[in-house]
Design a protein with these regions (language model features):
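Residues immediately within or flanking Cys/His clusters that coordinate Zn2+
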Residues: 1-3, 13, 32
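Short cysteine-rich clusters marking metal-coordination/redox-active sites
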Residues: 4-7, 35
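Histidine-centered nuclease catalytic patch
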Residues: 9-28
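Alpha-helical structural context detector biased toward long hydrophobic helices
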Residues: 25-409
């Protein structure tokens, strides 16, 4: 009999749980940590908080889930028209445009632009357009009520006969994504907790306290810190897109810390135990989502843990923390020299930070320098690798800046 690490009840029906959730394209799994009931409950409550958070990243890189396909991610053309990014990075339109014109012989012509394979939406928009322009149809001697089924039938026949033109947009595509926030803390803590017990059930920690925080989200905010160091927490031999998890004990500082970096762009540190006196622990795991291959990383964790709050806690800004942040920005600016990122996204991103004058001043200094590094917006004809790398660096910056603006619930 196995014992569930959440409800502590014994079970014999094996349940395959993703330590890194399937919604994140995770591949690390276990069959002896959770009972079926807890596995299902956590999936519908805690893992559910990740829905939609990283869909744009997954779709742009065409990453595979073991179960299901990532839904389209919302975006916009530069003209403002809505579109979606499909799995694999392909953009499709989301709306229907109908233009009406008349020729010298007083014949009405409709020019319709619509997303492929969205017949219900197309028919609905045709009906709406004709009803809204019924006076114009009646002036041309057309009964608008009969016009609706006739137009729908005519469009349907053209589609069946392939008498339509297919085209890709030449407009740059614009999207916004926000990484971070307290919604990530519960699923990340669940990942670290399961990862620890998957490898070391002998480690003595307050399991009930961690389980309560995962289940309720209470008193979890001060456990987490966004890692804005210029150097990565996990080092790899190959360039890739990695999920990484690590755990390390700091016996001198009496701390047990967990480290998570999702997609190589959302690095977090969490305090599993603030008064740890158990055995030494050092665990690490990495998975390259581009090569679909597990790879053991070299860990680059902080050498000390006693100052972890002073160094990374941006809930209260100090001159020292601002210096660390400036160092990270300067490092990222070197990366931006080589890639294009959408200018409007950066303009939207660099919002005023009102609760600390020193931070606001730094933003005003940073914005012109960033804009000098920005070239034209990326359109959908750029090579996917280049577009992906630019997007990757933009996400790092976005998550880093969001650390200033996070506030407790």
């Amino acid at each position: 009999m196995k014992k569930c690490v959440f409800c502590e009840k014994e079970f014999d029906e094996l349940s395959c749980e993703h330590i890194i959730p399937n919604v994140l394209c995770g591949h690390l799994k276990s069959k002896d940590l959770l009972c079926v009931n807890c596995n299902n409950t956590l999936g519908n409550t805690v893992d559910k908080l990740l829905n939609g958070k990283f869909d744009m990243i997954i779709n742009i890189f065409g990453l595979a889930r073991e179960n299901g396909i990532t839904p389209p991610a919302a975006a916009k053309l530069m003209s403002g028209r809505p579109c979606s990014i499909l799995h694999g990075g392909h953009p499709v339109g989301n709306d229907v445009q109908i233009d009406m014109s008349t020729d010298p012989e007083n014949h009405i012509s409709l020019h319709i632009t619509a997303p492929e394979n969205k017949i219900k939406l197309l028919n609905m928009e045709i009906s709406k357009f004709v009803a809204q322009n019924k006076d114009a149809f009646m002036r041309h001697g057309v009964d608008y009520k009969n016009a609706i089924p006739n137009i729908i039938k005519g469009v349907s026949e053209k589609i069946k006969k392939d008498e339509v033109q297919y085209r890709r947009t030449h407009e740059p595509i614009r999207f916004q994504i926000a990484l971070g926030g307290s919604d990530l803390y519960r699923p990340i803590l669940k990942m670290v907790y399961l990862f620890l017990l998957h490898h070391r059930r002998d480690v003595k920690i307050n399991r009930r306290e961690l389980v309560n925080k995962i289940e309720s989200g209470k008193n979890i905010y001060n456990m987490f810190f966004y890692c804005f160091d210029p150097q990565n927490l996990f080092l790899y031999k190959h360039v890739g897109l990695y999920h990484s998890i690590g755990i390390k004990s700091f016996r001198e500082d009496r701390k047990l810390l967990g480290f998570v970096d999702l997609f190589g762009m959302a690095p977090y540190i969490c305090i599993l135990d603030d008064n740890y006196d158990g055995e030494d622990v050092l665990l690490a795991y990495g998975y390259d989502l581009l090569r679909n291959k597990e790879e053991m990383p070299e860990v680059n964790f902080p050498p000390k843990a006693f100052d972890i709050k002073d160094k990374y806690d941006f809930k209260a800004t100090t001159r020292e923390r601002l210096a660390h942040f400036r160092e990270k920005c300067n490092y990222l600016l070197q990366l931006f020299e080589f890639y294009s990122i959408p200018e409007r996204i950066i303009q939207d991103l660099l919002v005023a930070v009102n609760y600390d004058p020193s931070v606001s001043q730094f933003f005003s200094e940073l914005k012109p320098k960033l804009q000098q590094c920005i070239v034209s917006a990326i359109d959908n004809f750029f090579p996917q690798k280049e577009r992906g790398c630019a997007f990757l660096h933009e996400c790092i910056l976005r998550g880093m800046l969001s650390a200033f603006q996070e506030k407790p619930n």
